[in-house]
From Swiss-Prot:
Coiled coil: none annotated. Pfam families: Evr1_Alr (PF04777), MIMI_R596-like_C (PF21491). GO terms for cellular component: virion component. The keyword Acetylation does not apply. Its EC number is 1.8.3.2. This is Probable FAD-linked sulfhydryl oxidase R596. Its cofactor is FAD.
């Protein structure tokens, strides 16, 4: 069996059920604030990527004008002031500028919006490791395909098996990635905090593959990794679980839940926050709070 086909068994790990929120807030004092980006952002990206994949293969002058106006206007209506300012800057400068060449055909427009999405992620210091081809494969799976005509239904009827495949693609979410060399800084502290061995299985696979995400994506455990990480992230958000310890012995280092994410080469933290956490772990070691 080739290295790329090797699979290290990954034990299934469970996530505790959500606790009911007791937060009661008077929203009247916040009516002029924007909306939380992590709530509307994913849906916004999905819709606007879909808009670009609906662009004609050979657009007319009217098509180009309408789509250009749409993407320019988008910068005026995003429900977050900083997002609006950032988006407007991206579409007017550098390789993410919305030029006439961008509107040449479907390929150029979809590639442009992919670059915009990456530029935003880079500014936020997060990485998902998705290539343009990955995005194309996902959104092309959403394209309607006609099966046998049904007398009682007008228009194209998409076969159920194709719909099922498309919905699986829609609901399958990629989780953020963190490089193996960064995660290795947290392995010792994860073991010291009593995290079960079953959480280290994916890390063992990543080590065998030298942290190569292209190879990791070929493994059957990659899909499970993404599903687990997305469930863990959701669990932390819905239960207000922090990513960094705020007090006590481990202050400044990742919480238990965040360490479990890191062992799957994932994190809620951005690049700067991961580096800060590494520095805090090293500081503990240097001051002998963590015994050798």
């Amino acid at each position: 069996m080739s290295l790329s086909k090797q699979v290290v068994p990954t034990h299934r790990v469970e996530i505790a059920p959500n606790s009911e929120s007791t937060c009661k807030m008077d929203h009247s004092n916040y009516q002029h604030n924007g909306l939380i980006t992590k709530i509307w952002g994913t849906a916004g990206w999905t819709f606007n990527h879909a808009v670009t994949f609906g662009y004609p293969l050979n657009p007319t002058s009217d098509d180009k004008r309408r789509y250009k106006n749409y993407f320019i206007s988008l910068g005026d209506v995003l429900p977050c002031r900083l997002c609006r300012e950032s988006y407007k800057k991206f579409i007017t400068t550098g390789k993410t500028a919305l030029t006439n060449e961008v509107l040449r055909n479907r390929h150029t427009l979809t590639k442009w919006f992919y670059d915009v999405h990456n530029a935003v992620n880079n500014k936020l210091e997060v990485d998902y490791g998705l290539s343009y081809e990955d995005v194309v494969n996902k959104y092309e799976s959403f394209r309607a395909k006609c099966g046998k005509p049904v007398p009682t239904v007008k228009g194209c009827v998409t076969p159920l098996d194709h719909k099922a495949f498309s919905f699986k693609k829609l609901y399958y979410m990629d989780a953020p990635i963190v490089s193996l060399d960064k995660v290795e800084n947290f392995v010792r502290i994860a073991r010291m905090r009593g995290i079960s061995d079953k959480y280290f299985c994916f890390l063992e696979l990543a080590t065998v593959l030298n942290g190569d995400f292209n190879e990791l994506k070929k493994q059957s455990s990659w899909e499970y990794r993404n599903k687990y990480c997305q469930k863990k992230i959701r669990h932390m958000r819905e239960n207000a679980i922090p990513s960094i310890e705020e007090q006590g012995y481990w202050k400044g280092t990742p919480t238990i839940d965040e360490l479990k994410l890191l062992l799957f080469l994932c994190s809620n933290l951005n690049r700067t926050e991961v580096n800060d956490a590494i520095n805090n772990v090293e500081r503990l070691e240097s001051t002998h709070y963590i015994e050798n």
